[in-house]
Amino acid sequence: MSKVHNSEYIQELSVDNTSYKIYDINKAASDIDLPLKKLPYSLRVLFENVLRSNGSKQSLLVFKEWLKTKKSDAEIDFMPARVLMQDFTGVPAIVDLAAMRDAMKKIGGDPLKINPLIPVDLVIDHSVSVDSYAAKDSFNKNVQMEMKRNIERYAFLKWGQQAFNNFKVVPPGTGICHQVNLEYLAKVVWHKDGTLYPDSLVGTDSHTTMVNGLSVLGWGVGGIEAEAAMLGQPLTMILPEVIGVKLTGKLTGIATATDLVLTVTEMLRKKKVVGKFVEFFGEGLKNLMIADRATISNMSPEYGATCGFFPIDQETIKYLELTGREKTQIRLVEQYATEQNLWYDFEHAVEYTEVLELDLSMVHGSLAGPKRPQDRVNLNDVASNFKYELPNFALDNKDIDKKYAVANQNYEIGNGDVVIAAITSCTNTSNPSVMIGAALLAKKALEHGLKVKPWVKTSLAPGSKVVTEYLKLSGLDKYLDELGFNLVGYGCTTCIGNSGPLNPEIEETINKNGLVVASVLSGNRNFEGRINPLTKASYLGSPILVVAYALSGTLNIDLTNMPIGENIYLKDLWPSKEEIDEVIANSINSSMFIEKYSDIFSGTKEWKDLQVTNSSTYNWNKNSTYINNPPYFKDIGSKNNIQDIKSAKILAILGDSITTDHISPAGSISKTSPAAKYLTDHHIEPLDFNSYGSRRGNHEVMMRGTFANIRIKNEMCKGVEGGFTINQLNGTQQTIYDAAMDYKAHDVSVVIFAGKEYGSGSSRDWAAKGPGLLGVKAVIAESFERIHRSNLVGMGILPLTFTGNNTRLDLKLDGSETIDITGLSENISSYHPVKCVIKKQTGAIRTIDLILQIFTDNEINYIKHGSIMHFVVESLKG
């Protein structure tokens, strides 16, 4: 077998009288006695990828060995077909590429070697906020405000589009990247230079996994890994375990795809599938259309899996037809999948690492909350669940049921009242069944004389223009409008924390009385402080239930048994499956997809009017508070040996489930934060602070925003919420940023201690970049979430785990200790053991064992070079 081209496996496949080349995985499997039909479909895609990417016989044999034990510790190189980005993560990625060009020039290389070698699509969707709502002109007002706030960022992206090859930008106001990917960008089977191969991707957003519902293998990575992939570097990975989920039956009653994904999230999070593939199979697939599957795949990060994959079948073809893909492309998919044994075979049993079963008929109406997406609650238990959770919000129980008057209004609010009801997120707005269902419920509510409660902020932010088109065509848009669910934008909005301000009088009442009010949204995450700083409780649910809770205005109601209005119950308003299906059949067609996506890259007049300089390197403006040349390459070219960590101080001691939102928040910038001080020092008014997410192109803001989440709890500061620590150099309580800068000034390294699932949530690389710039050398935790561990390695930060059942709690740390980490050397290997020496102020010394969570040779190289970016630049220079 040739290691260079594997040319003996190139075969011809004729489709519509055109001949294409394919890499025949059946023949390659036969040559190594690999029973291909026993291999999970997701691994068949990887097998083809390795074969086509010049994989050696040894790398192909890894798949055969996998079948023996259904797991592996062998690594493979994955070469994705393309990269998907959104603007919050995309801007810093393009900043990094621009800085890499400068670095390449600095060390005497060719700056133009820094160029994407595979297609990169960036969709601007993360910057629109719900400033205006419940009005006909809300969309236009929010778009205008978005452009005003982000004109410098958008001009930078437009510069990048002309400066880099293979890089396209979908302008703002078009859609959400994952829904655009599902409905338009994804091909299922890619063809380039006459060769056919499975579509695959990585994305700089954790919910890139959504497209696995359309049988396109992909997952989220940090921006720095995505940059490496763009520049032709393979993504080295351990061949994962694959958990099979056998689906049977069909959804019944009021259960929707949203309820299904919340059930799957609850089930799989308990199963601990972090770092594993999940693959769905069974007769139940026949009862799930692609939109339902996409909802399930979207929330893979929430259940912890690398991806949730659905094989190609007839539903895939039907969706490609519905969304207006070219007929030739559809035939390519069908014939290629059949030829390569990628078409789902209901008769042939695949072998999985483990198999779980889920009967779809057992799924019930649900919400998930109040703080984690895996905490599913049956609809009839929501009120009691909220009451049970209230003490966890440090509430004084004596006033738990008290109502408080809102100034200048004729209503009162109290704990459990819903102040935000948002139909938002690609997770659900990509699914016509729940969107039509929400509109039909709105129609019936109005017919029964019901209105949304006046303290509820309502919004509709779909993931593509097709949604508003079919709502308009069906005549149902007017009912959502009348209830206040007017279009506010085509973007992520409330789901990522861009919910905008509440009514000032409501905000005052909440703050003055310490109320625990809630948001109900059709999103995928509800981590504390994420949706809005004032909604401590957030529940996820279907768009239909979002409308229902907007009508009730409170969580303190059992919607299954208590009336929403006078003698009006949820069952009186709930649309039947037949009603929903009839509207879908009459209102959704392929022509609307073709029309709405025909000018996807054009943009508004404001976008077209943005003027940029044609140049290969970026002209940095040192006074910019949005785009700044990062300091990652100051020591480019210098030898960066791995050294033991000596006399480090503890910057923070954190608990379980610390999310990337806690580490690097995306939402609003507090007026009292270090980032706010930096901005005001640069003459930026608080009204123009924008969000942390929008300023990820400026490292000065992002360093100051690291660990600045108002809900984070550092165990070194008892009873204090927010980004504070004890500076051991002077014994005072300071912001984490200020203390870190003091340590840096005194050449003192710092480390972090944490609990389980450190770095869960979004893929944001700033949750690794920020700590790196603060001087963090290592994070010591019980476990890491997949993407964040990779990001830490990519920034040269050591991810270390305890051995056995040890935890930070066993160590009885107070933060005053001095830390040594020994055993690091040029000869580190995967899962390298090291010693951690903890020196107490009393003089007591304790030594514990830790494991360095580095998996592959490439990751070892990243650590040795100081970061993945240094490694890539120096490799490309040659």
Curated annotation (Swiss-Prot):
Cofactor note: Binds 1 [4Fe-4S] cluster per subunit.
Swiss-Prot/TrEMBL catalytic activity: citrate = D-threo-isocitrate; (2S,3R)-3-hydroxybutane-1,2,3-tricarboxylate = 2-methyl-cis-aconitate + H2O
CDD domains according to UniProt: AcnA_IRP (cd01586), AcnA_IRP_Swivel (cd01580)
GO biological process, one term: propionate metabolic process, methylcitrate cycle
EC annotation from Swiss-Prot or TrEMBL: 4.2.1.3, 4.2.1.99
Cofactor(s) needed by this chain: [4Fe-4S] cluster
Pathway: Carbohydrate metabolism; tricarboxylic acid cycle; isocitrate from oxaloacetate: step 2/2; Organic acid metabolism; propanoate degradation
Binding site for [4Fe-4S] cluster: C426, C492, C495
Gene3D superfamilies: 6.10.190.10, Aconitase, domain 3 (3.30.499.10), Aconitase, domain 4 (3.20.19.10)
Domain of life: Bacteria
GO MF entries: 2-methylisocitrate dehydratase activity; 4 iron, 4 sulfur cluster binding; aconitate hydratase activity; metal ion binding; mRNA 3'-UTR binding; mRNA binding
Keywords assigned by UniProt, alphabetized: 4Fe-4S, Iron, Iron-sulfur, Lyase, Metal-binding, RNA-binding, Tricarboxylic acid cycle
Family per similarity comment: Belongs to the aconitase/IPM isomerase family.
Quaternary structure note: Monomer.
Name under which the protein is recorded: Aconitate hydratase A
Organism: Rickettsia conorii (strain ATCC VR-613 / Malish 7)
